[in-house]
């Protein structure tokens, strides 16, 4: 499964590096992709989607399968809210939220949920033939 990520402060990049996935691209590297992917992003300001992520999704949302978001619990209701906004705007599941660069349990949860999405997508693709 392809993981596309945006890491303004480095937290999301550190999280991605701890997962078992090697098929990962930054937003810049993913420009022009034409395959299913999961996006992982941080949240900026008062619970907003970073502009580069919004612009990327405006061009490439057709293959978006799910989202995961990083945030800081100090922001209360705005914690990792970019994930909520992407999920509702693009009608994809929010896999999870994790704080800053995540902990070991977050990494395990992410790995499991990405596998579930990947298996579901594979079944749906096979059944459509």
Curated annotation (Swiss-Prot):
It comes from the Bacteria. One of its GO terms (biological process) is protein modification process. GO terms for molecular function: FMN binding. HAMAP family: NrdI. Probably involved in ribonucleotide reductase function. Belongs to the NrdI family. This is Protein NrdI. It comes from Macrococcus caseolyticus (strain JCSC5402) (Macrococcoides caseolyticum). The lineage of its organism: Bacteria, Bacillati, Bacillota, Bacilli, Bacillales.
């Amino acid at each position: 499964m392809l993981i596309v990520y945006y890491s303004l402060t480095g937290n999301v990049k550190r999280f991605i590096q701890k997962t078992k996935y090697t098929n990962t691209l930054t937003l810049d590297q993913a420009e022009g992709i034409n395959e299913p992917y999961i996006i992982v992003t941080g949240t900026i300001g008062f619970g907003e989607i970073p502009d580069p992520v919004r612009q990327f999704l405006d061009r490439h949302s057709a293959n978006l399968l799910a989202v995961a978001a990083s945030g800081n619990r100090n922001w209360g209701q705005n914690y990792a809210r970019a994930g909520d906004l992407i999920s509702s705007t693009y009608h994809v599941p929010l896999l999870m939220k994790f704080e800053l660069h995540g902990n070991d349990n977050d990494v395990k949860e992410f790995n499991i949920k990405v596998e579930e999405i990947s298996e579901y997508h594979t079944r749906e693709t096979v059944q459509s033939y």
